[in-house]
Amino acid sequence: MHDLVDFKGAIHVHSRYSDGSDGMETIIAAARAAGLDYVLVSDHNVLKAKTLGWEGWHDGVLVIIGCEISPPRSGHVLALSIHDCDGMKKMSPPEYLRRVREQGGIAFVAHPSGNEIRDFNLNLASWKDWDNPDYHGMEIWSYMHDWIEGCHIRNMLEYIRNPQDHITGPQPDVLQLWDQLAQSRRIVGLGALDNHAANLPFRKLPWKILKVFPHEQVFRTVRTHVLIPPPSRTNHGDVDSFIDALARGRCFIDYALLGDGTGFQFTASQDGLDYQMGDSLPAGRPVGFRVQCPQPAEIILLRDGAAELAADGTALEHSTDGRPGAYRVEARINRKPWLFSNHICVRAGEEEGKKKRR
């Protein structure tokens, strides 16, 4: 596990190839200026950026191209590692998830709670197909959807001037659902942006007054850190390595305005074997959990969504008797949400995978 590299970046970004306002060059420059290692662009119902060769390394930034499959009356997903999304927006979730799987792709539920705000021409259906086995994970924190809750025409300027004052963190019901689902199978949790670098007014009017939430600004907020083997700096190998790590849940989320989460670790050990976020290990034998934060915080270890242990500082260690459960970590700074790990699951009957001996 110690040879993994922390790759931090932005997930769920829109370009001019759908309804974003900026081209790929601008997005990549913003990612580099914000100190990101990667950016994941997921335009609505198109893979044009991939077709035109944008996936891979550009100016030191790894660009991943996916597609936000966006039916008008059902939930959306971010689909990765696919080559064709034509017609999927007219399909039901079971149909398009099957198409993604048949192409060897993976899917993550986007903004699972949906949203409807008439002032901003926003009408997104919530996700209903939680029992479907063909999705790999879900956005647990979406920056723009967090910000827009409570925003309307009368207070919009205040929300734009001071967006950080209106960010509250993941919705509790989304975290509760995530913890519940993770008890039966791996469900990867992502931090996402859903950023368009939009122009005001948001409604489809013939004139535009002001660009709000430019990408560089938003790229310094909710980020997903993905733990990957040292990159080779070759396009296909590093893209595949990144997507594989994401699918395995080798990732955590930080809110960078409170501090850079680079260096965060959440691991488990059992019988001389080490386990990483996204792993499962057998129940019934002692397990040791270790947490390391890059700066002091309130650290909370949760089991099935309930606090198991909390500590202030940069480290937490906890030993259990191997009780089944989906274990994860939250960290807060000044009572504000900062870090969210993915789960390490202890399951009855779980087969031991190939783990690294210490």
What residue ranges belong to the model's regions?
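C-terminal functional module detector
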Residues: M1-D6, S184-G189, L193-R358
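A metal-dependent hydrolase metal-coordination microenvironment
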Residues: M1-E158, T168-S184, A192, A198, ...
